[in-house]
Amino acid sequence: MIQRSLAALVAAALLAPSARAGDAERALPPEESFFRTLHAARRVGPVTLNGRMDEPAWQAAELGSGFTQARPSEGAPPSVQTRFRILWDDEAIYVGAECDDPEPSTDTLSRRDRFVEGDYVSFDFDTTHDRRTAYHFQVFSAGQQLDGIHYNDTDMTTDWDGAWDSAVSHTAKGWSFEARIPLRLLRIPDRAHAFGFNIYRILSRLHEEDQWRYRPLGRPGDISRLGVLEGIDGIHPVRALELRPYVGARLIRTAPAPGTTVPDAALGACSSVGLSPYRVSEACVGLDLRYNLASDLALVGTINPDFGQVEADQRVLNLSTFETFFPEKRSFFLEGIDLF
């Protein structure tokens, strides 16, 4: 009798979490209720990147709003309002947003592509609408940028660096920004189609994340659950040539063998045939290039790549037992990273 009672108690304890999980899943609205669509307007008139969105051209674009809180109160209205608009022309896509905040967090300035504590807005473009890959762009209230590539729906790398522009402006109501994303950075098929799109806002002091196209935390998928951006069609290939030269140098000094007397001049003197045997210098020059053949096809090449060097200009104090890892930043080796 006691054994049967104990078995029933254990079974009830095991079934309770699954029942609660099932109740939470059933409590979520159907997926169709989260779908969002926005229409991007073709730019008519100039847009100056000053962060204020005060040009008449912005008024022609549909106003996006109605964010939903993802954290900490999942599904609740946001604490403050966020409004955004999207423009485009033959060369770029423009994203502008106004972020209300009566008590903005202290801006933390940092290097590009560094996650820091602070307020920011990020947005994703799935330009091929394959629901697996997307370009990620992020603008902090302090003005710094971060970008990367989403792949396999839920994975992301920030190793990819795109050349795009943004500007931030602060007002008594909060802050706003304008961003210009050149089309030459994006793979866009020639055929007319919609983009996958979503925009997010982080409020650091409240530990809050607001989403335009709300993604419930209990359901898997990131890029497959983006909203839809319509109106960008008739784009012609931007045949831009991008060149990234680099120069590297290395100096090696070898100390003379013990007991060997070497004139001081020999350690640093140059001769007609080069440096002295105790000083050896090496120099290398290379080039990465990219040429857009079509809106979704690019020729990427490299000349004399330096396989032994990575970007290492950031000082890193490593007190752990693990080696310091520096991410790959050379564009040639990052092209197609979402495919391999």
Can you describe what each PLM-predicted range is?
Residues 20-340:
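Structural preference for beta-rich elements and adjacent junctions enriched in aromatics
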Residues 1-7:
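Bacterial N-terminal signal peptides that target proteins for export
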